[in-house]
Amino acid sequence: QELRKWMQTYPAVKTVPEAYLALAQFLQYQNNQVERLRIVREGIAGYPRYEGINQLKNIEKEILNASLSLEIATAYPGEQQSVKVNYKNLTGITLQLYKVNLPVTSAVLQNRTTHFESKYARLQREEHFSLKPTTDYLNVDTTLTIQAPQAGIYFLKAVPDGKKGVSDGTLMNVTALKTIYRPLPDGTLELVVVDAVSGQPDSEAEVTIYTEKGGGYSPQQTYQADKQGTLKLDFLNSNKYWYNAHTAADNAMPILNLWKNDYYYKESKRKEVLQLFTDRSIYRPGQTVYVSGLAYELEKESTRVLADKKYTVSL
């Protein structure tokens, strides 16, 4: 308040424009972009010959600029999928879904360049979404819903209405596979490949071990799951895994890393683990939610299923 009063009382003082900058910074800390915009515009109009006028103009541009970012988790084929959107100064976007023509091991996926989708993907479909205007010039989060395509690697791109230079995109892995692991007394690792929604084991799945190479991944060894979707892995003289599960029809599971220390317990401490599964990823009002689970206990030298263990599941 004192700074504002001083600016109004002594408008002819040469240092007043500096006060506008200081006040704009203070309003930034308060996250009051509406008043901040008013102040910098007042300074620009009142002191057009100020040598630091571009600083005020840059603040005005920063406030008015649009911003956009996407975030999406691994999707399940054919299911409704949530897309997290963070944006500012936009009223609508078009989500474009591209099918990527690269294997999951490709270095290009990890180091995407400008116009990635035009070089390595083909447009499958697009859908427009309206966004609530951000009249306070602040970034907001919202969640949109799309239907996931069939298993594969995709690129999801958001193109703003009437705005250029602020589009954003992210990889979207669509797979029905998920892995659960547990350590065994002999130092190996047991993996179970299951359906990510139902939790049912996948006996047709394989797990491949990779090493990093040139920004991508080079396959080293592949293991076949048994009828229970289970297989055992050795660490191959390494303390770290890069691996993924795949089938003939589903080879889009992201390549994951797992350090040996993530599950190796130096002390004999028990750890209870619970994995929950539902029959679908998104529900409509009134639908029944079917839940199944796998509960087991980890110890340094043993792993055992917790039979008849009771849990309370809350929605």
PLM region spans:
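N-terminal, cleavable Sec-dependent signal peptides of secreted/periplasmic/extracellular proteins
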Residues: 1-315
